[in-house]
Amino acid sequence: MLNFFRRLLGDSNEKEIRRLQPIVEEINRLGPEFARLSDAELRAKTDEFRQRLADGETLDDILPEAFATVREAAARTIGLRHYDVQLIGGIVLHQGKIAEMKTGEGKTLVATLPLYLNALEGKGVHLVTVNDYLAKVGAGWMGPIYHFLGLSVGFIAHDQSALYDPDYIDPNANPEDQRLVHWRPCTRREAYLADITYGTNNEFGFDYLRDNMAYDKSQLVQRELHYAIVDEVDNILIDEARTPLIISGPAQKSSDLYRQMAKLVRQLRRSSVTAKQVKEEGLEPDGDFFVDERTKSIYLSEKGIEKLEKLLNIPPGESLFDPEHYEKTHYVENALKAQFIYQRDRDYMVTPNGEVVIIDEFTGRAMPGRRWSDGLHQAIEAKEGVPIKNENVTLATITFQNYFRMYKKLAGMTGTAYTEREEFAKIYNLDVVVIPTHKPMIRKDLPDQIYATEEAKFRAVLREVQEMHEIGRPVLIGTTSVETSERLSAMLKQAGIPHNVLNAKHHEREAAIVAQAGRKGAVTVATNMAGRGTDILLGGNPDGLVEEFLRKEGLTLETATPEQKRAAWEKAKALTEAEGEEVRQLGGLHVIGTERHEARRIDNQLRGRAGRQGDPGSSRFFLSLEDELLRRFGPVERIKGLMERFVDSDVPLQAGLLDRTIESAQTRVEGYNFDIRKHTVEFDDVMNKQRQIIYADRKAILDEADMRERVLDLMAEEIQRQIDEHLSDGVDEFGLTELLRVYRRIDPTLPATVTAETLKGKTKEEIEQFLLDHLETTYAEREKAIGPEVMRTVERRVMLGAIDRQWVDYLTAMDELRQNILLQAYAQKDPLVEFKRESFRMFDELKANIAHDIVYNIIPASFQYEAYLRQIAEEQARRLATAQIAGGSSEVEQTRKPQRRTVQQIGRNDPCPCGSGKKFKHCHLGREHELAAFMNNAPATTPKVEPQPVKPAIAEEAAKIKAAIDNGTLPAASPKTPRGRQPQAVPRGKKR
């Protein structure tokens, strides 16, 4: 029925391709005309297009001519000409959609079309890849096209930024690879100011966060996010979607508890009754805990809780879940997960120097620098007995989902996106268009072979490898873990089959291994090939053989002459071409999958390694009923029982029913993971709106030259609030005393002669106006004393410091809220609704805290502005240093308790830490409790700085102010509009 309607209505993807065909025909029609242009005339097209855009034409209007220009420039510079299907891919990318293009179809070349077109607007465009190498190679390879057409190209990596310059030769680059030699080092800002910038998703995201930690406009590097093409878009926007980018700093927590819990959980016994049986059949666990493998969660049984309470020495009558013991449950849960769910060489590896490194479950890559959050990484370090690193506190964070949704126009390309089209549409508003291949796909995807046990499956894999190896066909074996790849490697070694292993432990040889995986008789064992970014060429890659041929002649790349290198390359090229033709005759690359992945997309990526650009090839998956996917989601027990009774262990089962079961299991897991990611977005959207408000405020402070009026408004609002609080029942001595005490924390210059007694006869309105006038006078005096320019700097630094300190604490509080809010589901409340309600309340509190921080610090900071600015500079340097090394970090968010600064031992003649400029004995001596309260409202993370000598001019000014304070003769406020509550008849532009 579905096929009937598809034939009746036509496939929507085919309709989309047909709709674009007239544009392709127009580009082809322009081809001969553009081919007749001289180089100068072709280059001049760029200026012509820019002028036409300025005159009112749109990008769509000039698209055919722009694409024809790039096509001709590519042919002249790098010898490649875009196929028609590549033109279709370029149009799809320009339209802000995802182009699904199979392996080997030339995505790197396709991207030049929309990048050039959109760069003509002069707002900067980004090409996002999954690693630094691919970004640098891609930009360097396509660089001659852009340079020929007068566009600049930048490249950013974690520790490097550069501009493409054909006249520059990098002395440290391999001179044989022209893609890498013409990168001239530049500043980060210059790389972003280029017309086109290539880089990784991590670096673009981290630069955004770093920009929003800057204390000066000169530190900003990014422009407004205009247009981006995301390569391997499914990997970045789906696989990495739940992994936030986090810049963090150290938080102090004891590692002893992790070690204690790691030893303790080894005494607990796992229940043989599964989570599924507990939930569906109502069976009681027969151990201390049981595991839900589907959600990777661990649940303690009643028996387990009692056992833990004894092991933790919790007194009788008290519970592990009482508030005073509740923190320990977090350590217990992490220790259990580390011991019983996370496996070495599957989920992580331990390096020779004792570091726990996460293994990417989708690509099999080691991810140094990334750490699991919430103490899980520390729990695994305790389990493995390696040094435990400190937990961290989040300084800035954003998910890829929210970062990439900030671009005005977003597009993507990958070999596998169609199965995830619903998620791309719902979360990113991106349509997926499958681009036809240039040559027909002739790869044979053979039926799965399913065995009862894992042992039988691996024996079958070995037999198939031997069979292919004997006839000379190259074989690629894909595994889902380092452990499996090592196991297969041992079996192949025992069988005498030479092979290469590519996994997280051997990543440094990755490019060389993949480049030669298509040679005759080659056998390559690799963890998931997703994101490798290197094509497997039948017959091998000649570039990778040059060094080998030179070595046989006693030469190296450094000692060989250019003629010797050219001769070696010609020899390698002849060999690989001959081998390639022979391998094609044998049937091409054979891909073996040893386990189905949770996502069909990853399986398709593995299959896609064979049959590139019309080459022959084949693929087959070998499965067992003990595989994780079938064990977690399939009707394993019933089928396994039948197979053990009626089928020999080495005889595979090939049944359509089980194929449907596997696909159904994958679909369910994909749906489950989609729901989780959608859930993540719904929660993070709340935080994202708040982040945008805070970051916009930071940017406004950096951009605005004068924040004086805003600061005075905040101070006026605080004074009004304090008057309402302390004089709510009328003007009395107690209320006035408290009001003046608080006011002096804002403005320490209020004369001692101003007391509750002297103000007792005034009305609330008169008192308010008196304090506001005094405040403006003090502010004007401080500005005159240190100079307007310095005062503006103090304002910016105080305001940015207040935002950053409060934001860090807010991120921690929001993380705690997000973890705890899920308990609302048990109270029959919608966790998302409760999260929104509580987060809005907390955000209002955050804004109030920021204002409070600014108001109570600005005048004291102006008295000791040199020391204060030095403190801020040191704090900023630490934060920026943390941000700069954040290129490889990931989820490291940790909870912490608010840090409070305590008053140090102060000498009688030392300057008072409140910032008044007076000696301690004349200021807060005898009122240390007030000083402590004041200090705890000062910057919590500001480092202690020794008192600095005051410049003579400042000392003289301070002496005048001190004399005025002592004599009660501060100058009257200058006549200006009162900064207080105004009569209702007088309209105000903004509330003070």
UniProtKB/Swiss-Prot annotation:
It is an enzyme of class 7 (translocase). May bind 1 zinc ion per subunit. GO terms for biological process: intracellular protein transmembrane transport; protein import; protein targeting; protein transport by the Sec complex. Its EC number is 7.4.2.8. It catalyses: ATP + H2O + cellular proteinSide 1 = ADP + phosphate + cellular proteinSide 2. Residues 885-910, 965-992 are annotated as: Disordered. One of its GO terms (molecular function) is metal ion binding. Belongs to the SecA family. NCBIfam families: PRK12904.1, secA. Part of the Sec protein translocase complex. Interacts with the SecYEG preprotein conducting channel. Has a central role in coupling the hydrolysis of ATP to the transfer of proteins into and across the cell membrane, serving as an ATP-driven molecular motor driving the stepwise translocation of polypeptide chains across the membrane. This is Protein translocase subunit SecA. The lineage of its organism: Bacteria, Bacillati, Chloroflexota, Chloroflexia, Chloroflexales.
